[in-house]
Amino acid sequence: EISACLVGSEMCIRDRPMIDTEKLSRLLEELNIAVDGYAAQRLDLYAQRLVAWNEKMNLTGITDPDGILEKHFIDSIEPLRFVEIPRNARVIDVGTGAGFPGLPLLIARPDLDLTLADSLHKRLVFLKDVLHGCGLVAERVHARAEILGKDPDYREQYDIATARAVAPLPVLCEYCLPFVKVGGAFLALKGAEDEVAAAKCAMATLGGELEQNVPYKLPSGDSRHLVVVRKISQTPTKYPRKPKKIDTKPL
């Protein structure tokens, strides 16, 4: 079986898809998530390059096709089920790592104006390769979140901020809410543990308000939470603080 995709200016031809694109399409249909027509091919290219680059740098511990499909791609796209993201919205993925959830969201919604921010340059080099292969464009920024969040070119400039990280929710709020303009939202993709109660003080301090706390399950049965924090007022200028204070004295 030959799979060929003409994406942007690059044609990629491979012996067979790495991920089960029929399964992907079926899962997205079951979740009632509409995606761009090239999404399956682009996600397959992403998976192949993720595994290839992972051999020379640590991007992910999940390298099997089903794991990538469900725990990286489906999980990253799930927010589209619960949150209406406006067309052409400005989105920043904070601490993007290997690109999750920001890049799968862009693949599903190429209209988004995406910024991928990370403190490790080599991850951004990997993401440049994937973006080029997919014929997509996103700004890549090599910076620490606590510094970028005080830069006027980025502070309160985004409709949506996203993060998928193991850091506690109060910590994520302090890193991410400063990027969100009033009226926008921070989307935190978290594991099964419900951390919302501990983060309500941080949300209020930073100008946010809990809008949704949605539990959902991946096709594998793994439990997740999507926490949606609406920005209702500007973040005080003292935030975000330095990482040591954020970690040792969380809001």
Over which residues does each language-model region extend?
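SAM/dcSAM-binding transferase cores
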Residues: 197-251
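Conserved SAM/SAH cofactor-binding pocket of Class I
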Residues: 77-165, 173
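Helix-to-beta-strand junctions that scaffold the AdoMet/dcAdoMet cofactor pocket
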Residues: 109, 180-182
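Short "lid" loop at the C-terminus of a central beta-strand within the Rossmann-like core
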Residues: 146, 168, 191-195
